[in-house]
Amino acid sequence: MLIALAGVTGVGKSYYSQEIENNFNIKKIHTIRTRAIRPGEIDGITGYFMTEDELDNEIVRGNIAIDFSEFGGRYAYLKSEVFSNDNHVFEMHYTHIDGWKKVKPNMISIYILPRNIEIAINNIKSRNLSKEKEDERIKEVYEQYNNFMNNKELQKKFDYIVYNDFNDDSKTELLSLIGRIVKKWIFL
């Protein structure tokens, strides 16, 4: 089983993917990134950090399931994890839903929607990004939020939409949903 979490930057995708890993027999997929490693991130745990050339070599070797450019960097995922028999969760950018559904048609997609967009914005501001990168991310949050809210066809592409109020009730709701998905998946 592969579960994808999407939503605006700062909505809690990383937090919830960690909670899912902690509460269920579901591992996080390691995202390959070509951007610089951030303080607190650990290569091989947070994800894999590669140069452009290293990623290109992995593609040539046939080890990459999907790759794309976003936020001025390249991102990719290993076939060995995407097509594993293990249960996995990962975070994806909402614009890649169609590509992911082609790669993994039975993937379960969850869009996490903030009820209060300003909390997501404050989460971005707490990341110690450069002013330019912070402004870029905040602009993208508003664009993504408005696009998602006004595009019913886009909303239909996701299996579930859950709201994050950034509280225990939201956490309980999302983890309960994951519990139901896991139970249903076991009996397929």
Language-model features and meaning:
Residues L5:
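Hydrophobic anchor at the beta1->P-loop junction of P-loop NTPases
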Residues V8:
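P-loop (Walker A) phosphate-binding loop of NTP-binding proteins
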Residues V11:
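ATP-binding Walker
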Residues S14:
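Walker A/P-loop
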Residues T31-H88, Y94:
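ATP-dependent small-molecule kinase phosphotransfer cores
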Residues V89-H93, V103-R127:
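Conserved phosphate-donor/acceptor-positioning beta-strand/loop module used by diverse small-molecule
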Residues L129-L177, L188:
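Small-molecule kinase domains that catalyze NTP-dependent phosphoryl transfer to phosphate-bearing small molecules
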